Structures are given as structure tokens and as C-alpha cells.
A protein has these predicted regions:
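Structural beta-alpha unit
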Residues: 1, 14, 40-43, 66-117
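Small/aliphatic-rich secondary-structure junction motif
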Residues: 1-63, 90-92, 156-177
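Charge-dense, low-complexity intrinsically disordered segments
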Residues: 9, 63-66, 70, 74, ...
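Gly/Ser-rich helix-loop-strand patches that form or flank binding pockets
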Residues: 15, 19-21, 27, 96, ...
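Short hydrophobic/aromatic-rich motifs at helix boundaries and adjacent loops
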Residues: 52-57, 77-79, 108-110, 146-148
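Alpha-helix N-cap and loop-to-helix initiation/capping positions
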Residues: 71, 132, 166-170
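Conserved active-site and cofactor/substrate-binding residues in soluble primary-metabolism enzymes
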Residues: 74, 78, 135, 173
Length: 177
């Protein structure tokens, strides 16, 4: 039975749609939703900041890392507030986690406590994916052993869904969701 649903959110339109799906599933199964936003450590410690510093002609990390971390955390809080608002409007119990790390890894590390993960097909760069899965979505699907519902552009509850089945034990387990 589905009692705990993990919903990663970056505040994008696809994440918002995933929240709507998760709310519908939580309502049906009387489940608790667990929202998570991960501040991508690669944006704080990787070449991104060095490139900005070089473009501006300043030494890297002097003030930028702290300022960018604050901005990214604020963006995460905003995304999680929207998640909490959607849950409150639907009278669905929820909790939220704001963390910093590698995005897919952080989601997968939280997944063993969950019965289902619901996430959007793509995130903030979705318009450039040309129908492909976003890198975070693909990494989560490949790495977790939990069932994953990847949402598209349709309205929740709008119709059928597709389940891939190859006869393996993992596929049989997935059908029990």
C-alpha cells in the first residue's frame, strides 16, 4: 500500500504538475507527501562560479558562493512553500526537506523510506529536452529501487498510464503498486 510519496520539486512547471499528480495519489491512498528540494552543490562548488568570476574579472568565491547559496536556498524555500500550499488546499499531510547536495543522489538517498516517487519528466530546462527525460529524472529512475511515476504534460487522472513489464522480479514488484 502507498502511504509515503516523495515529491522532488524545483519550482518548475513540470514539478508543479508532478505535485498535482502526487496530491491526487495521496488523496486516493490517504498517503503523506514528502516534498524535497535539493540545492545543487555543483552550482556552488563547480566550474559555474569560477566561470562567473572570470567573466567579471574577480577572484572566485570571494562573495559569490555565499550570495548564490542564499539565492538558491530562497528559490528552494519558494518551491517548497508552493508544495505545502498545494497539500494544505487538498488537506493532504506533508513535510518538506531543503538540503544541499547532488540532486539525484539526495533524492535516491531519501527514497528507501518511501513507497513511491513522483517527479516531472524534466525540470527547469524542460523546454529544451525535445521529449527526453531530464538528467535528474533519468538518474533517479535508474538508481532507485522504489516505484517512480514520471509525469508528463497531462492533467492528473486524465486517463491511462503505461507500465513497462519484462517479467523480472523488479517488474512484478512494480505491478503491486
Amino acid at each position: 500500500m502507498i502511504k509515503h510519496i516523495l515529491v522532488p520539486t524545483d519550482g518548475s512547471s513540470m514539478a508543479t504538475l508532478a505535485i498535482h499528480y502526487a496530491v491526487a495519489w495521496a488523496r486516493h491512498y490517504e498517503a503523506t507527501l514528502h516534498g524535497i528540494h535539493v540545492v545543487d552543490v555543483k552550482l556552488l562548488e563547480g566550474p559555474f562560479l569560477q566561470d562567473i568570476s572570470a567573466s567579471l574579472g574577480t577572484a572566485p568565491y570571494i562573495n559569490y558562493q555565499g550570495n548564490i547559496a542564499m539565492l538558491l536556498e530562497e528559490r528552494g524555500r519558494t518551491a517548497l512553500e508552493a508544495f505545502e500550499k498545494a497539500c494544505a488546499e487538498a488537506n493532504i499531510p506533508c513535510d518538506v526537506t531543503l538540503t544541499t547536495g547532488l540532486v539525484a543522489r539526495s533524492i535516491v538517498e531519501k527514497s528507501p523510506l518511501m513507497d513511491l516517487i513522483v517527479l516531472g519528466r524534466g525540470g527547469e530546462h524542460n523546454q529544451w529536452l525535445d521529449g527526453l527525460l531530464g538528467s535528474t529524472t533519468e538518474a533517479v529512475v535508474r538508481r532507485t529501487d522504489r516505484p517512480v511515476l514520471v509525469t508528463g504534460r497531462d492533467t492528473p487522472g486524465a486517463g491511462r498510464f503505461v507500465a513497462a513489464y519484462d517479467g523480472s522480479q523488479h517488474a512484478r514488484n512494480a505491478l503491486h503498486v
